[in-house]
Amino acid sequence: CSDEDLLVQIKAVISASRFYGEGYRKVWARLRLKGIRTAPRRVRRLMKEHGLQAPHQVRPAGDDQHDGTIVTERVDEMWGTDMTQTVTTEEGRAHVFVAVDHCSGELVGIHAAHGANRFEALEPIHQAVARHFGGIRGGIARDLTLRHDHGSNYMSDDFQDEIKFLGIASSPAFVRQPEGNGVAERAIRTLKENLLWVRHFATVEELRQGLLAFAETYNATWLRERHGYKTPNQIRAEQVGLEPAFTIEHKMAA
């Protein structure tokens, strides 16, 4: 098709995407999913000429995030967990917790709470274990490793004792080393850019529901370049069988 026709399709893909700042490679992949075949460099050229390129982020020297370096070949071998903060309009500060699969990038657990103690930090882990291992009982997740930082909630006896009970091996990240918590940190950055920085929530419960909806969309539509532009749900389905739909009624929302 002509450049003009392809540009129309590129703009349509960008408008339809629920994610901010996707680069030309993902736009090209989404065009392919629509049956539109073209070269990635052509998509890049048109996006550049018409001001459609994703913002380019240059990290400051000394930034030791290592996104994507601690990846696994199979799902449910290693998860990463981390937290961030946001502000609700009626209830003030809220804490957001995530758990992310290091193979597929799937948001396996997500939670919001007023506080940031070790019990709140455990919530996305409980969600994910119940969903992907079939329940909460001793040793059920014995083949899983959990990457986390050195925050007091994650290093507390209660947190460490609980994941040990579940059979999960603790893997604290080390500062200024490639074995960082970059996978979870990258997921939180995407969450901020596409939800926390662009929407307002009145209450923590409203935020929690918004996070669940975001996770459903993310797992179903976010494209993973390393896996040939497949979604987290597709990656899991290929490895372990068809995954049930992520719904608010699911255990994750409990």
What are these language model-derived features?
Residues I10, V27, V43, D82, ...:
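Mobile genetic element proteins and their domesticated derivatives, centered on retroelements
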Residues G80-V108, H114-A116:
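An active-site-proximal beta-strand-loop segment
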Residues C1-M78, Q177-P178, T231-V240:
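Basic, flexible linker segments flanking DNA-binding modules
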Residues T88, G92, I110-R137:
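Active-site beta-loop-alpha junctions of metal-dependent nucleic acid enzymes
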Residues F19, L33, V71-E73, T88-E90, ...:
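Conserved, non-catalytic sequence blocks in retroelement Pol enzymes and Pol-derived host proteins
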Residues Y20, I136-R142:
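Short helix-terminating capping/connector loops at secondary-structure junctions
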Residues D157, K164-I168, T190-A254:
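C-terminal domain-tail junction helix/linker
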Residues Q57-A61, R142, L146-H150, K164-V183, ...:
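RNase H-like polynucleotidyl transferase catalytic core
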